[in-house]
Amino acid sequence: MAMSDEAMFAPPQGITIEAVNGMLAERLAQKHGKASLLRAFIPLPPPFSPVQLIELHVLKSNFYYRYHDDGSDVTATTEYQGEMVDYSRHAVLLGSSGMAELRFIRTHGSRFTSQDCTLFNWLARIITPVLQSWLNDEEQQVALRLLEKDRDHHRVLVDITNAVLSHLDLDDLIADVAREIHHFFGLASVSMVLGDHRKNEKFSLWCSDLSASHCACLPRCMPGESVLLTQTLQTRQPTLTHRADDLFLWQRDPLLLLLASNGCESALLIPLTFGNHTPGALLLAHTSSTLFSEENCQLLQHIADRIAIAVGNADAWRSMTDLQESLQQENHQLSEQLLSNLGIGDIIYQSQAMEDLLQQVDIVAKSDSTVLICGETGTGKEVIARAIHQLSPRRDKPLVKINCAAIPASLLESELFGHDKGAFTGAINTHRGRFEIADGGTLFLDEIGDLPLELQPKLLRVLQEREIERLGGSRTIPVNVRVIAATNRDLWQMVEDRQFRSDLFYRLNVFPLELPPLRDRPEDIPLLAKHFTQKMARHMNRAIDAIPTEALRQLMSWDWPGNVRELENVIERAVLLTRGNSLNLHLNVRQSRLLPTLNEDSALRSSMAQLLHPTTPENDEEERQRIVQVLRETNGIVAGPRGAATRLGMKRTTLLSRMQRLGISVREVL
């Protein structure tokens, strides 16, 4: 016969329901959680036997909730395995919620009696409604917590996605990602290890300064070869390590040593995989070993997947900007190369002073020695520098020029040595300096006498050590550059006046070249005048083929304080104002000290005689045929006692200059 509900919940003999309710009602009514529910049973009123531990096992969730008589409570996934004298196990039917099991445990004293078990069984039945209500609340709380967790996970993924989509610059990207990860997880360290083919190092470590308000991201060289990184990149699987478990690895791996020095106890390395490419890894560390739960690791893997895409995009953008800069530099270098292709044979002269100078140029060009070109303004120092470069083994590498007087002192250091991003206000990108651009080639430092004193030690260091440091950077960059300096100032006098460092002067003055002013080589003026006339006439589409004798006399009688540059400007103005085929030289230019008259200098008369006749196409063709014939007779040999220059009665450089002007190639002639 089935037991009625009244009989089922009736108290055992000797127990009044009022006594039990009076003691349990207040505790059971609280129902603030598992501990409150179990706490209602300890201590039990007489005639219940005392217990030291109560354990509730909910089969649906498979959790064990324990409450001790000392007031402590524990949630576990396995039942109590500690010392016990006896226990009493009782099933609790929860309807649609399944079953639970209540254990009353005695850890010391005597064993339970049958009456104890009867009392415990009755208690298990009367708490069924309370337990059912509590489980319903618990399920709702669990569902709510899951929804909140999903919401938080979705939020952090959205924030990370927004961060990676809003930046193409790698520095800003990593800084924003580090800030979002730190904000959500509270990690002590967020870093990235990325491969960088632009640097000598295989990998660079990007460490975020999480203590700063702007969460700055600071790239640095890898401290050494990391076994942990190699393993992660090879397997393409996350690697989690704890210092307490892997002490041997933490004492030897450079990445882990760096983290340990900052107080970190656990580290997670997640590969950044984008397609078939793994450019690096996300390095996370914390002072606790419990933060990297399985759930957090899965979320961090999703974050790493988004970061990998962003890093790929940032790298592609950086490659595009580098390519753009490279193309601009290449365009500049090609323009410079067109000018630097002018060798000694293209320098117009016939004076002995220039012949002696160019012999020195020919000697020094074959070495890597530093050259200091001195001379007045307008004497052609840059032309000589280009000739040295063109005759050197570096001719196929760039010739880079910088005018030290034309750039403000505040910008000159950046132009020479470059700067890293953030080195100063407005430095939004990394900038390569002229030394880096000229690597492998030649750097021409024009107007070196105007180099500020504060930059001279840095230039001296580059000349000595062959390495530079960008402005705002800490990494040394080796450079292989041949330096040619030029000045129109008296550097030695500047050294004595303490306006120029003596040690830098000696470094630059390895092979000095002194360019003669135009007034000291007047025999070159007719040739230069003819060259500039032809050049300007072609440029202005004028048919000017003669220079009057009187015009040449007057040109050769001036002292030319502006030297060749001034002569070129005078000829340009004359060509501009000429309306016929004979150069109309306007003499409204100030005349200063006159040079010796033509009658007193046979060299000047000889120079004049070569230019008194008009330069006609017929004369050019005759000269061309004569040079071609002699080249064929000498088998293309230009210099030497059997060369064409000797047979034609002219210097080698003069012959080469005329061959270029007339379009004669030895290869085509033979």
From Swiss-Prot:
GO terms for cellular component: protein-DNA complex. Keywords: Activator, ATP-binding, DNA-binding, Nucleotide-binding, Transcription, Transcription regulation, Two-component regulatory system. Disruption phenotype: No effect on expression of the hyf operon. GO terms for biological process: DNA-templated transcription initiation; phosphorelay signal transduction system; positive regulation of DNA-templated transcription; regulation of DNA-templated transcription initiation. Residues 169-311 form the GAF domain. Residues 347-576 form the Sigma-54 factor interaction domain. The keyword Aminoacyl-tRNA synthetase does not apply. The keyword ATP-binding applies. ATP binds at residues 375-382, 438-447. A motif (Cys-rich segment, might bind a metal cluster) lies at residues 207-221. Residues 641-660 bind DNA. Induction: Induced during anaerobic growth in the presence of formate; part of a hyfR-focB transcript, it is not clear where the hyfR promoter is located, nor if the upstream operon (hyfABCDEFGHIJ) includes these last 2 genes. One of its GO terms (molecular function) is ATP binding. A transcriptional activator of its own operon; when overexpressed operon expression is strongly enhanced by low pH (under pH 6.0), strongly inhibited by O(2) but only weakly stimulated by fumarate. Expression in situ is very weak. A Cys-rich motif in the N-terminus (residues 207-221) may bind a metal cofactor or iron-sulfur cluster and be responsible for sensing redox or other signals. This is DNA-binding transcriptional activator HyfR. It comes from Escherichia coli (strain K12).
